[in-house]
Amino acid sequence: MRKKIYFLLCLLTISLMSFGQANDPLVSNCVMNAGANARYLKDFRIQLGKATTQGEPRYKANMSLWKNTKYRFTLCNSEDSKGQLILNLKDDTDKIVASSFDQQTGKTYSFIDFLCNKSGIYQLNYDFAGGQQGSGVGVVSMIK
């Protein structure tokens, strides 16, 4: 009888502890903005102060992407951000293969779709336009 009570007590404790992190509303909204045909894979929370010099993006992360898979990179800013969150996606040769910022028009896109032509490790480079300070979220999804 004691073993059953102990087992039930352990089971109850584990089930109460198994709840994940509290939902971040910015992440939740950004996942919803990715679209109904997008399957969430990962998010990156970015918080940066004002840059002292312009140049290389200040937040870098690596991610493995698979050939013949279409990905959507969704970018969301918090309300108090001074600049717009931008993403440059680089392949293993350090070549930019996709960007949310069009240098010719100066337009920043809230998401970009990328069809991966070569499996490998890709570098996600995040920053805020003009080196401004801000916080935001980058969500990576797979398109069905």
Task: Report residues per predicted region.
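Noncatalytic modules at the cell exterior or secretory-pathway interfaces
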Residues: F114-Q132
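Extracellular and analogous surface-interaction loops
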Residues: Y59-T69, D113-S119, I143
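Hydrophobic beta-strand segments within beta-rich accessory/binding domains
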Residues: K60-S78, Q123-D127
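Extended, low-complexity, turn-rich repeat/linker tracts enriched in Gly/Pro/Ser/Thr and Asp/Glu
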Residues: N77-L85, G130-Q133
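Edge beta-strands of jelly-roll/beta-sandwich modules across compartments, strongly enriched
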Residues: G130-I143
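Short, surface-exposed beta-strand/strand-loop-strand elements in extracellular ectodomains
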Residues: D80-I96
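Non-catalytic extracellular/lumenal accessory regions of secreted precursors
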Residues: Q21-Y59
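N-terminal signal peptide c-region/cleavage motif recognized by signal peptidases
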Residues: T13-M17
